[in-house]
Structures are given as structure tokens and as C-alpha cells.
């Protein structure tokens, strides 16, 4: 049987304190990324990009699934998305989804998101996330599995899309949902302390992999969060997915304990801007150039 899977995406990293709101036009012409695309134009537009959706497409097609494109868009980080823009894009995706359902039953839905979820009833839903997503209990409850990127700077977006698609194919094959466990962190992590190339985050990511291997969990979604998105659910959080509730709880508790044990290490001493500029000029010397 050929699986019929809907695929789409809606990505934005919103800074609550940035002065310029994000408009619909910013999604149509984002600069550096494919512009808003829908229906038959979507797959050709995003297939060769570095975003998670491209990795999901590759895995689905390798598995012989029939992909039903909805819509996909991204805008560069800026102020909150204008209500009119959000509603317009959400309505567009929902319209494409409704048309897909009218054409025949869907076996699953994959979404390329930054940090939001879409409710699609009883149809299995997985999504890839930016780890700066402010993961909430509602997002976990209203999806089957979430797969954040594992790197910051983000160099594994396509891999995350592939992981999310594999989770969707596994969920469809299982016929029953994964057991889930959600945990919220007790403190915020500054962006400057989130780089996965160095400790403490590098050590946390290494332990995440070890916990997955030890518990046999299907996925351990760890989101560092984006502390500049000012809303009640803001903050680091994680979700574990496994074949049993015991395994999901064990994986989630272990990673949360690892993060909490490193709380002091996430506090970085930063240099005020004026001091940083002066130090850079001194370091560069009279011949320059000065690079900051």
C-alpha cells in the first residue's frame, strides 16, 4: 500500500522586543530562502534547499510514499508576525489540507515548523523544529512526535526533517501512538550559552545521545528555547517518545536532570558593547582591520 502523506511548513523566529513586525510580504520574499509556495509548486521549490523539509521529502520518497504538498514558507527572524499575515498563511495551509482530505484519506502529516503545532484530528502528525522553539505541553499533546535540530549554529536541518519523517513512517506502521513524556526546564538559557560546539551544551547533546541509546526511546526532543519570545510558555523544554511510558519517562527525566545539573555552567560572563569594541580595536592593532 502506498502511503499518502501531506507535507508543508510555516517557519518564523519571533523576537517580542524587535521594533519591526513580520509581514506577509516577508514570507513571500524572505531573502536567502525559497518564497512562499503552495500546491504543485511547493516540492520543486524546496527540494534542493537546506531546510528540514528537503530531508523529509528525501526520506518519504525513498520509502515510496506519495507526497501531497500543502504550502511552505519562511521569514527571517524579526518582530512578531502580524495577525493578518499569520491568519492568511494558516488559512492557506488549512485550505490545501482540506483539499487533500477531499481528494482521499491521508496516512500522515509532516510539518516543517520553527516552534508551533497544527491540529489535524486523528491523522498522525510529526514535525521538525528549530531547537529555539518554545516547546509547550500543548504542542506535544497535539502531535505524534517532534524532532528538533541537534545543532546551533544549525547545520542539520535536513537531518531533522529526515528524523521527523522516519518517526511519521514508524508511527503509521505501528498503528498506535508513541508514549510521550514532557518536561519543562527550571531556568532560561541565554542564546550565547546555547552553542552545541562547546560545553555546556555540547556535553548535554552528548548525554542526550547516550540516553537515547540507553533507554531505547524513539526520539528525545530537546529545545533550548528562545528567551526573547515573551509569552507564558517561554523556556527550555523536552519531550521523549518511546514504545512504553516507562521508557519515555526515564529518557525525559534523565535529560532534564542533565540540564539542571549544568545550570551554573550556562551563565556566561559577557563584555559590554563599548568594552568589546575597544578590546577588538586594541587586538587588531594600528594596521587593522577590526573584526567583531
State what each model feature region is.
Residues 53, 57-98:
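Low-complexity, highly charged intrinsically disordered N-terminal segments
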Residues 161, 165, 169-213:
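Conserved anion/nucleotide-ligand pocket segment
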Amino acid at each position: 500500500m502506498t502511503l499518502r502523506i501531506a507535507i508543508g511548513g510555516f517557519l518564523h523566529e519571533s523576537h517580542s522586543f524587535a521594533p519591526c513586525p513580520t509581514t506577509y510580504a516577508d514570507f513571500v520574499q524572505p531573502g536567502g530562502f525559497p518564497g512562499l509556495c503552495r500546491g504543485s509548486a511547493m516540492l520543486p521549490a524546496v527540494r534542493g534547499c537546506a531546510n528540514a523539509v528537503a530531508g523529509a521529502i528525501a526520506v518519504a520518497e525513498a520509502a515510496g510514499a506519495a507526497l501531497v504538498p500543502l504550502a511552505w514558507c519562511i521569514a527571517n527572524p524579526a518582530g512578531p508576525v502580524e495577525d493578518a499575515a499569520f491568519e492568511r498563511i494558516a488559512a492557506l495551509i488549512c485550505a490545501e489540507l482540506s483539499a487533500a482530505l477531499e481528494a482521499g484519506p491521508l496516512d500522515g502529516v509532516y510539518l516543517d515548523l520553527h516552534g508551533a503545532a497544527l491540529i489535524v484530528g486523528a491523522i498522525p502528525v510529526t514535525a521538525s523544529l528549530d531547537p529555539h522553539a518554545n516547546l509547550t505541553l500543548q504542542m506535544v499533546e497535539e502531535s505524534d512526535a517532534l524532532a528538533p535540530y541537534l545543532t546551533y549554529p544549525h547545520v542539520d536541518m535536513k537531518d531533522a526533517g529526515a528524523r521527523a519523517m522516519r518517526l511519521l513512517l514508524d508511527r503509521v506502521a505501528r498503528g498506535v501512538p508513541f508514549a510521550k513524556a514532557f518536561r519543562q526546564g527550571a531556568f532560561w538559557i541565554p542564546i550565547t550559552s546555547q552553542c552545541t560546539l562547546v560545553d555546556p551544551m555540547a556535553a548535554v547533546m552528548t548525554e542526550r545521545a547516550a540516553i537515547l541509546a540507553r533507554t531505547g526511546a524513539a526520539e528525545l526532543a530537546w529545545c533550548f528555547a528562545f528567551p526573547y519570545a515573551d509569552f507564558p510558555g517561554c523556556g527550555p523544554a523536552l519531550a521523549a517518545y518511546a514504545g512504553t511510558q516507562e521508557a519515555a519517562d526515564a529518557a525525559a527525566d534523565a535529560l532534564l536532570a542533565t540540564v539542571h545539573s549544568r545550570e551554573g555552567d550556562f551563565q556566561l560572563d559577557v563584555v559590554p558593547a563599548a568594552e568589546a569594541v575597544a578590546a577588538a580595536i586594541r587586538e587588531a592593532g594600528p594596521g587593522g582591520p577590526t573584526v567583531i
